[in-house]
């Protein structure tokens, strides 16, 4: 992998490539608390609702720590925060850092193997991919993945994997038709960008497992995150091959930063990220003639199927 494509692709110093162990640094301790959020509390007759993690603060603390250390635990917190703030593109870039330093600095990456024991590293992966059936599993990242938008129509609306699952599990045919209409009304370039990002994430997960396999000290259980991303991929593969139209691609400079995706650039270690921004859907807003044509076609199809 070309380290120049990574935000933190350099070593901290020549004498100490991965810096110092920040396990007891106040910033690390704050990260470990912030990632949990605050559970629901009861004070007398009052119920104080649970508070989700403050991803802005988590990203800030993790970024600060990465100036001084190369620590798998910090990279995982940083990856989760990037997913929360930037979508699948953030997840991919975080995984690329994890892969790069696991491959290039196996003996120096914190926490360092303890006489061949990498259990501390394997345990750190549980935040990204909790073990199925574990009663105390942290499902934070899983919930973030389920909320990622997979189709985004300016008129019909945006739908996530959670929405798609719910429509399938409840047998809600109306919801399924709306999701299909939203897919057909989504710009083809952006759909392709998300699919490419998904493919690259899956490749990165495979490469991380292979890296740990090759060292023979234990392999992280990445089945849950892999299965969810594969489910996203399956959604796209099950959709119609033809789009209603092919709108002009949106440049990164013209579109929002959130939920950016990547263009393909496969290497053995991972893939270089070339961001392609995804649109933030604004229901009811048409941006030009092509939007209007696609919307009319999608609506006509919906009426034909539902009100012949």
Predicted features and spans:
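N-terminal domain-start signal
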Residues: 1-114, 123, 131, 140, ...
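Mid-to-C-terminal functional-domain signal that highlights helix-capping/loop sites
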Residues: 111-293
């Amino acid at each position: 992998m070309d380290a120049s494509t990574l935000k933190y692709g350099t070593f901290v110093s020549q004498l100490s490539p991965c810096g110092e162990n920040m396990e007891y640094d106040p910033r690390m301790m704050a990260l470990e608390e912030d990632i949990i959020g605050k559970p629901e509390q009861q004070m007398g007759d009052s119920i104080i609702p649970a508070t989700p993690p403050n991803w802005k603060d988590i990203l800030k603390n993790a970024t600060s720590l990465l100036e001084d250390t190369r620590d798998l635990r910090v990279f995982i917190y940083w990856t989760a925060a990037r997913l929360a703030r930037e979508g699948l593109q953030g997840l991919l870039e975080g995984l690329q850092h994890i892969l790069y330093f696991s491959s290039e600095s196996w003996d120096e990456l914190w926490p360092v193997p303890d006489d061949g024991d990498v259990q501390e590293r394997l345990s750190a992966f549980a935040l990204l991919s909790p073990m199925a059936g574990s009663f105390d599993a942290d499902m934070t990242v899983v919930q973030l993945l389920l909320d990622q938008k997979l189709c985004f129509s300016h008129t019909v609306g945006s739908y996530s994997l959670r929405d798609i699952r719910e429509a399938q599990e409840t047998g809600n045919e109306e919801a399924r038709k709306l999701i299909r209409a939203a897919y057909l009304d989504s710009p083809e370039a952006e759909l392709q960008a998300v699919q490419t990002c998904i493919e690259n994430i899956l490749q990165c997960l495979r490469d991380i497992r292979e890296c740990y396999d090759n060292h023979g000290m234990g392999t992280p259980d990445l089945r849950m995150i892999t299965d969810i991303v594969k489910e996203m991929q399956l959604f796209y593969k099950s959709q119609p091959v033809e789009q209603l139209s092919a709108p002009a691609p949106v440049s990164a400079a013209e579109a929002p930063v959130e939920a950016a995706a990547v263009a393909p650039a496969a290497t053995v270690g991972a893939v270089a990220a070339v961001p392609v921004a995804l649109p933030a859907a604004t229901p009811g807003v048409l941006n030009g003639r092509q939007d209007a044509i696609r919307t009319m076609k999608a609506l006509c199809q919906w009426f034909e199927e539902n009100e012949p």
